[in-house]
Amino acid sequence: MSQNGKIIPNLDQNSTRLLNLTVLQRIDPYIEEILITAAHVTFYEFNIELSQWSRKDVEGSLFVVKRSTQPRFQFIVMNRRNTDNLVENLLGDFEYEVQGPYLLYRNASQEVNGIWFYNKRECEEVATLFNRILSAYSKVNQKPKASSSKSEFEELEAKPTMAVMDGPLEPSSTARDAPDDPAFVNFFSSTMNLGNTASGSASGPYQSSAIPHQPHQPHQPTIAPPVAAAAPPQIQSPPPLQSSSPLMTLFDNNPEVISSNSNIHTDLVTPSFFGPPRMMAQPHLIPGVSMPTAPPLNPNNASHQQRSYGTPVLQPFPPPTPPPSLAPAPTGPVISRDKVKEALLSLLQEDEFIDKITRTLQNALQQ
């Protein structure tokens, strides 16, 4: 299909997943399978000492993958802002909490991060998959099974047995050394269905940052209630955009695709998408772009811009304060730059302090 002499890729669900898997395997050859995909996410990091959020230079498509070696499960964000992709291991010490459309988590390095999802349903589905994976680790800790084929490293990592992870998540139904407990064998029986339904199939033009309409009913995990101020307004997506498996790097940097014009009109306020993050009473909108990397050149004409593909991306804003389980309050006093400045100014106003400085300088010069 072509429009204005430009070639538009026409990929179905399987072709898109295969292409995404090929790109991921260039980064990590041990990746075997993509379990689920989120079309667009933005990352924030939480400073525990200052109790405030700051924007990380990470945004793009999120992929939860299964690997053929340790660690068995990871999630990867193909970063559109720079060449550094974000990779996190899904191990037993991974903690998370959902406050849609945010997923807050603490990793093995004790860093507290927040993931903002464009699609709140994808946030819930990713959280459900995280829960299935982490529950497998907790099951192994409660019911350890001896396996002569496991290495010492695997024993220390306290991961689920190979049959638990490989059996239900693999396309093949056969597995070696399958445990006797049927609950282990069927533990991830619906994981692939979750990944597949979240990636609805459609033939037609495909764009890398299109956030699709998905007809299936999402899984509903047990999550914390969403924050009222963080509820995004509903934005209708154009009907032709249906695939939620975004096409990654091969098309994201193509200026021909990025600069295409169309019939989608957006009436948006002037964005502050790339300024320092701040708390807002209600979310703002930014113009719909294929790969959001810069504000519009002429903000006054932003409402007149026309794009052929993609939908307006909601203005991300700092997530809510993480719960004490993820970010405990600091126990000691916080020393900030302003407090140091105030202390020095108060010392300079004391004559005794000035006399001590003067005597010290005189003694140093005499020596």
From Swiss-Prot:
Stretches with biased composition (Pro residues): 315-331
Alphabetized InterPro entries for the sequence: Dcp1, PH-like_dom_sf
GO molecular function: enzyme activator activity; hydrolase activity; protein homodimerization activity
GO cellular component: cytoplasm; extracellular region; P-body
Domain of life: Eukaryota
Tissues showing expression: Expressed in seedlings, mostly in root tips, root hairs, and the vascular system. Also present in roots, leaves, stems, and flowers.
PANTHER family noted in UniProt: DECAPPING PROTEIN 1, ISOFORM A, TRANSCRIPTION FACTOR SMIF DECAPPING ENZYME DCP1
Record-stated family: Belongs to the DCP1 family.
Quaternary assembly: Homodimer. Component of the decapping complex. Interacts with DCP2 and DCP5. Interacts with BCHA1.
Name the record gives this protein: mRNA-decapping enzyme-like protein
Organism whose genome encodes this protein: Arabidopsis thaliana
Taxonomic lineage: Eukaryota, Viridiplantae, Streptophyta, Embryophyta, Tracheophyta
